[in-house]
């Protein structure tokens, strides 16, 4: 395994650990999710380019489309929660509260 793969895997792991540790704020969770998606995109692109997989060349672009949709929905949810409650805590997303 080359150093590039190790660094990208380390970036994914750090983003995942950040998602587990800083899950109280919605903005921190969204940033960690974006870091995970970016590292997956780079890893997938490098793997496809090195192995010359021409049939799978659209897969990273599809992943980017899903990442953009996830970012747009996450930011709209962040704006809605912050205008309604005044904070961006994830605990405000619980719909079963009175």
Curated annotation (Swiss-Prot):
Disulfide bonds: none
Function summary: Core subunit of the mitochondrial membrane respiratory chain NADH dehydrogenase (Complex I) which catalyzes electron transfer from NADH through the respiratory chain, using ubiquinone as an electron acceptor. Part of the enzyme membrane arm which is embedded in the lipid bilayer and involved in proton translocation.
Subunit structure, as described in the record: Core subunit of respiratory chain NADH dehydrogenase (Complex I) which is composed of 45 different subunits.
Gene Ontology molecular function terms on file: NADH dehydrogenase (ubiquinone) activity
Main subcellular localisation: mitochondrion
Keyword annotations of the record: Electron transport, Membrane, Mitochondrion, Mitochondrion inner membrane, NAD, Respiratory chain, Translocase, Transmembrane, Transmembrane helix, Transport, Ubiquinone
Membrane topology: Multi-pass membrane protein
A Pfam cross-reference name: Oxidored_q2
Biological process, per Gene Ontology: ATP synthesis coupled electron transport
EC code(s) of this entry: 7.1.1.2
Transmembrane stretches, start-end: 1-21, 30-50, 61-81
EC class of the enzyme, as a word: translocase
Compartment(s) of residence: Mitochondrion inner membrane
GO cellular component terms, A-Z: mitochondrial inner membrane; respiratory chain complex I
Keyword presence, Isomerase: no
Family named by the database record: Belongs to the complex I subunit 4L family.
Organism, scientific name: Neovison vison
Name by which UniProt lists this protein: NADH-ubiquinone oxidoreductase chain 4L
Record's catalysed reaction(s): a ubiquinone + NADH + 5 H(+)(in) = a ubiquinol + NAD(+) + 4 H(+)(out)
């Amino acid at each position: 395994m080359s150093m590039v793969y190790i660094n990208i895997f380390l970036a994914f792991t750090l983003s995942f650990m950040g998602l587990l540790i800083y899950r109280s704020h919605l903005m921190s969770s969204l940033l960690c999710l974006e870091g995970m998606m970016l590292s997956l995109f780079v890893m997938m692109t490098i793997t496809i380019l090195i192995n010359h997989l021409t049939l799978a060349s659209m897969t990273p672009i599809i992943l980017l489309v899903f990442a953009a949709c996830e970012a747009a929905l996450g930011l709209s949810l962040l704006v809605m929660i912050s205008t309604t409650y005044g904070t961006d805590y994830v605990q405000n997303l619980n719909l079963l509260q009175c």
